[in-house]
UniProtKB/Swiss-Prot annotation:
This is ATP-dependent protease ATPase subunit HslU. InterPro entries: AAA+_ATPase (IPR003593), ATP-dep_Clp_protease_ClpX (IPR050052), ATPase_AAA_core (IPR003959), Clp_ATPase_C (IPR019489), HslU (IPR004491), P-loop_NTPase (IPR027417). It is found in: Cytoplasm. Belongs to the ClpX chaperone family. HslU subfamily. It comes from Shewanella loihica (strain ATCC BAA-1088 / PV-4). One of its GO terms (molecular function) is ATP binding. ATPase subunit of a proteasome-like degradation complex; this subunit has chaperone activity. The binding of ATP and its subsequent hydrolysis by HslU are essential for unfolding of protein substrates subsequently hydrolyzed by HslV. HslU recognizes the N-terminal part of its protein substrates and unfolds these before they are guided to HslV for hydrolysis. GO terms for biological process: protein unfolding; proteolysis involved in protein catabolic process. ATP binds at residues 18, 60-65, 254, 319, 391. It comes from the Bacteria. CDD domains: RecA-like_HslU. Keywords: ATP-binding, Chaperone, Cytoplasm, Nucleotide-binding, Stress response.
Amino acid sequence: MSEMTPREIVHELDSHIIGQQNAKRSVAIALRNRWRRMQLDAALRQEVTPKNILMIGPTGVGKTEIARRLAKLAKAPFIKVEATKFTEVGYVGKEVEQIIRDLTDAAVKLTREEQMAKCKFRAEEAAEERILDALLPKPKEDWDTEKKDDTGTRQVFRKKLREGQLDDKEIEIDIAAPQVGIEIMSPPGMEEMTSQLQSMFQNMGPGASKRRKMTIKEAYKLLIEEEAAKLVNPDDLKEQAIELVEQHGIVFLDEIDKICKRGDTSGPDVSREGVQRDLLPLVEGCTVNTKHGMVKTDHILFIASGAFQMSKPSDLIPELQGRLPIRVELEALSANDFKRILTEPHASLTEQYVALMATEGVKVEFSESGIERIAQAAWQVNERTENIGARRLHTVMERLMEDLSFEASDKSGSTTVIDADYVNAHLENLVQDEDLSRFIL
């Protein structure tokens, strides 16, 4: 679990997302409160429930990006799901529980990686011995002896192995055969039975190893993973993973506005309202049966987000509104925000294009006037057509760089300066013509 302070979390989010300080502060506080809760005594800890968040804002302003970055910062089980997935044809009520099953799978993977990292030193030693055994096979008469022959020759090879002198040498070694993935088609609502059948068939499969020829460098990596996996206790793994989900799990529900009953429609809207009612027990707290064990959702943090262009937060059923007490509004982006998005974030769009062109030997420089004009063009198209926020920058940049990207392989060693004149020459007609910008940008 992350021990970062709210200020540190916001600072980290600032390096990837421009603006939206209110949303950043809310998720930072929510994440820090997870840590604060764990410092309480057990009795009080059970009473402190997470304050779920509803993020409201137009498309392309950073709602999903905040979730993506939060997943990396949290160091906790995290899953992002689209609420619209549960309104599809064939939907039945039990399917929402798949959210918790997927979250538990993520926790198992996270816990396994942590435990394997702790065993890495022992795994490296075991992998080293197996490679030395392959390089220096024992004589037939010594196969029954338990004591490993640690002669001077073995020590010489051990030294060479550690120094990387044998990395390119090929050896034949037994590697555990990967489990065969079995796909089972089942109707909606039968996910639990499907996962149990898959586990049963996989366990029935042979656990035999497969002899493969590869370089020592490749074999060493595979053997470390194999030996580390052997050192992980599966029962402890499941127990820790379930504890991790229950105490630190985070679920991001995207597009929640799409399961609202539309304000201007009459009559029942069974599918959408049904999804909301089935989400209620998860958000409020219930017990879900997973293949790893029973998981309680009482302390899982839910962050919901939606554009709410065709509906309002008040169109959600009252019970679900009550389970999302913290409301955060994200603001629409201005031309100045677009300018900052192009330059300030880590691995910004302009940095990406400069790096891509550099692989062809073409130097690209973005001038201040060029960046301003790109931002202005993207903002103008958003104003005249559909406002899709910062995603418009991807379309505009791709259109702007199209000619250069096509010709880059023939221009190795050249320098291209992208200033206002360059942008106008490549984009002005499209931006000015509303019909063209509607279909092309």
